[in-house]
UniProtKB/Swiss-Prot annotation:
This is tRNA (guanine-N(7)-)-methyltransferase. Its EC number is 2.1.1.33. It comes from Legionella pneumophila subsp. pneumophila (strain Philadelphia 1 / ATCC 33152 / DSM 7513). GO terms for cellular component: tRNA methyltransferase complex. It holds the Pfam family Methyltransf_4. InterPro entries: SAM-dependent_MTases_sf, tRNA_(Gua-N-7)_MeTrfase_Trmb, tRNA_methyltr_TrmB_bact. Gene3D superfamilies: Vaccinia Virus protein VP39. Catalyzes the formation of N(7)-methylguanine at position 46 (m7G46) in tRNA. Substrate binds at residues 136, 168, 205-208. Pathway: tRNA modification; N(7)-methylguanine-tRNA biosynthesis.
């Protein structure tokens, strides 16, 4: 089992809007999966339906992409993992407003969630969009995407399932590509290797659109479990 003691995130006290606080206070209980439940989650039970693919998004931020993907793919289950309360409140408020029923959230460290709550071979895919690049070299050990972490993810994903990462930090993109390419249980969706075009399934965020206008690059990587 992976034993990760170095956190890939820092919890800071940030401002929470009235709407985000409403989401946390009034509607989070409708969507939250509790980490302290005694056994791994049964997704058929938690989502109230059988035979639906379950996709995990790690670090969903303000929930923009997760919300759009859930709305566009009602046949899929989405589980979002996030530790920052403002983003959780924002997503939950949107889910409530639009009555989206195919999303669940867990407010906890993603590594611990994956270690203890996600059954093996239960996921259709995992998506990690714009993780903290920890760009200073002395902080690289804090990067979420490391070989040991990917080895754990592979166990949770079923055969033919995917890992989809996106980053706007080229050095981190190169690191992710090396890590994923080194995992023997995965193959690159790009037959010639390297990065993938942005899949239509990943929505463009306002942040990304602004970056494109400024000439910033974004690198997508999609690997499939053999």
């Amino acid at each position: 089992m992976m034993q990760r003691k170095i956190k890939s995130y820092v919890l800071r006290a940030g401002r929470i809007s009235n709407r985000q606080q409403q989401g946390l206070d009034l509607w989070l209980e409708d969507y939250e999966l509790k980490f302290d439940s005694p056994t791994p989650w049964n997704f058929a039970k938690e989502f109230g339906r059988h035979d639906a693919d379950t996709i995990v998004e790690i670090g969903f931020g303000m929930g923009t992409s997760l919300f759009a993907m859930a709305m566009n793919n009602p046949q899929c289950n989405y589980l979002g993992i996030e530790v920052h309360k403002a983003g959780v409140g924002s997503l939950v408020a949107d889910l409530h407003e639009y009555q989206i029923s195919n999303v669940r959230v867990v407010v906890h460290d993603a590594v611990e969630v994956l270690q203890t709550k996600i059954p093996e071979n239960s996921l259709a895919g995992v998506q990690i969009f714009f993780p903290d690049p920890w760009h200073k070299k002395r902080h690289h050990k804090r990067r979420l995407i490391q070989s040991e972490f990917i080895q754990m993810l592979v166990k949770k994903i079923r055969p033919s399932g995917f890992i989809h990462c996106a980053t706007d930090w080229e050095d981190y993109a190169e690191h992710i590509l090396n890590v994923l390419s080194s995992e023997s249980a995965l193959f690159n969706q790009q037959k010639e290797g390297g990065y993938s075009p942005r899949p239509d399934s990943r929505p463009l965020t306002k942040f990304e659109l602004r970056g494109e206008r400024l000439g910033h690059g974004v690198w997508d990587l999609v690997f499939i479990k053999k």
